């Protein structure tokens, strides 16, 4: 009993310390909105703040979101679990995102389901916080989540700022458990006899975060005992160096001038040449932000554009152009005759239909087995069956598909083996069902179709 009490007390102390270091409001009582899914992390956070609310003089409110992207029994079960737990403890709001809204948002944003669900979920957080006049919105990200995020960004070639990991505070969003590990969270829940729900999608290997969590991290622990400490030290050094670059950048004597009439950014050519590589990168990022909105731009584009010089006076890359014109540098959006990979499409199928893609016209046909996708030039029955709703889209970074041996193979590698022309690679139809790539329609470019159907295995 004494050990349980001490463990619980230590956990509460860590949560309180994390919260206090991020909270700058002195008005009382604080109104806190907790984002609770029913999983271990958010249930531990909720339980902790219910115990701490008198110490911090706070009113606790809970929001749980039903995304309607998992089976109804499972997703409604999670929501009802949270509602029941909060019943006599604190007010709880259930936000229902209508069915297919996440899929439609993924199509509109040209992203995956996870990103679309997060975008909609955070919109619900903001709306609920506004209606409750909440001071802060609390999410239950923990130390493990942060390491996973850092490693994913590291291997994706992210910038130094992104390698700082999950931000502890962004606006009124606070993450008080970033210094608490998942094992500490589960130990606290077990010792306090607090129930939680398991999300089956946390085990699905199709999601990059799950691959990192279940495959990469165990190997790191075997090969590099205590790797977390080493990573922390490296990140601290990167942060110090990046802070120096940012401080140096703020002393620059010129800025981009946005020319709205010409839809371009301008600066002095000699000033651009005078910047060293790190500052030139920051300067280009600033210019492209003025031009692009929020679209992610690969580092290779910046690397190309930085090469502007007296001998190389015009450069096209990634849908942008930088050129020397007189004594100025002009930066603007431009599509050239160069081949571009900036193609994305996504069509969600939930009923028989005909639809157009950059790869041509397709039909979604239904029979007793399910849905089949057939290209206009295909004389066969096409590819399938698939269970709706499913998506026909262009490829995304990290796409993988099952092989006949049961292992996974990257779609990029398959495309390379098929020798698909560069301009056709990003219009090759990919079929995604339940967040998993289940088919590649290779026949549109004279290749064999590749698809996975239930227990029947891989068909090529």
Swiss-Prot record:
The EC number(s) this enzyme carries: 6.3.4.19
Reaction equations catalysed: cytidine(34) in tRNA(Ile2) + L-lysine + ATP = lysidine(34) in tRNA(Ile2) + AMP + diphosphate + H(+)
Molecular function, one GO term: tRNA(Ile)-lysidine synthase activity
Superkingdom in the source lineage: Bacteria
Keywords: ATP-binding, Cytoplasm, Ligase, Nucleotide-binding, tRNA processing
Note on domains (UniProt): The N-terminal region contains the highly conserved SGGXDS motif, predicted to be a P-loop motif involved in ATP binding.
Name of the molecule in the record: tRNA(Ile)-lysidine synthase
Native species: Treponema denticola (strain ATCC 35405 / DSM 14222 / CIP 103919 / JCM 8153 / KCTC 15104)
């Amino acid at each position: 009993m004494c050990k349980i009490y001490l463990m619980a007390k230590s956990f509460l102390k860590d949560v309180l310390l994390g919260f206090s270091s991020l909270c700058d409001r002195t008005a009382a009582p604080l109104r806190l909105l907790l984002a609770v899914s029913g999983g271990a992390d958010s249930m531990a956070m909720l339980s902790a703040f219910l115990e701490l609310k008198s110490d911090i003089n706070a009113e606790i409110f809970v929001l749980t979101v039903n995304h309607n992207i998992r089976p109804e029994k499972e997703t409604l079960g999670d929501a009802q679990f949270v509602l029941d737990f909060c019943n006599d403890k604190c007010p709880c709001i259930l936000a229902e995102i209508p069915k297919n809204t996440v899929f439609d948002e993924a199509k509109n944003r040209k992203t995956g389901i996870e990103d679309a669900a997060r975008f909609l979920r955070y919109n619900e957080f903001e709306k609920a916080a506004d209606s409750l006049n909440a001071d802060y919105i609390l999410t239950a990200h923990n130390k493990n989540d942060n390491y996973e995020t850092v490693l994913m960004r590291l291997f994706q070639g992210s910038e130094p700022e992104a390698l700082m990991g999950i931000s502890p505070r962004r606006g009124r969003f606070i993450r008080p458990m970033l210094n608490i590990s998942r094992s500490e969270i589960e130990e606290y829940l077990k010792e306090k006899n607090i129930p939680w729900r398991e999300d089956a999608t946390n085990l699905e290997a199709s999601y990059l975060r799950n691959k990192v969590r279940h495959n990469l991290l165990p190997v790191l622990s075997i090969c590099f005992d205590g790797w977390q400490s080493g990573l922390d030290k490296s990140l601290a050094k990167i942060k110090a160096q990046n802070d120096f670059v940012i401080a140096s950048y703020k002393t620059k004597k010129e800025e981009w001038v946005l020319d709205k009439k010409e839809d371009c950014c301008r600066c002095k050519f000699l000033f651009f040449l005078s910047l060293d590589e790190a500052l030139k990168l920051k300067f280009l990022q600033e210019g492209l932000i003025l031009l692009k909105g929020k679209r992610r731009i690969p580092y290779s584009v910046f690397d190309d554009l930085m090469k502007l010089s007296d001998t190389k006076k015009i450069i096209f890359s990634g849908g942008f152009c930088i050129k020397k014109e007189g004594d100025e540098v002009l930066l603007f959006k431009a599509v050239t005759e160069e081949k571009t990979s900036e193609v994305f499409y996504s069509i969600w199928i939930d009923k028989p239909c005909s639809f157009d893609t950059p790869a041509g016209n397709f039909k979604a046909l239904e029979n007793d087995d399910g849905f089949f996708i057939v290209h206009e030039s295909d004389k066969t029955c096409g590819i399938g069956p698939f269970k709706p709703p499913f998506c026909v889209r262009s490829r995304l970074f990290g796409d993988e598909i099952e092989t006949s041996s049961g292992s996974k193979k990257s779609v990029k590698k398959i495309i390379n083996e098929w020798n698909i022309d560069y301009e056709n690679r990003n219009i090759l139809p990919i079929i995604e069902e339940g967040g998993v790539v289940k088919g590649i329609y290779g026949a549109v470019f004279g290749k064999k179709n590749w698809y996975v159907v239930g227990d029947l295995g891989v068909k090529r």
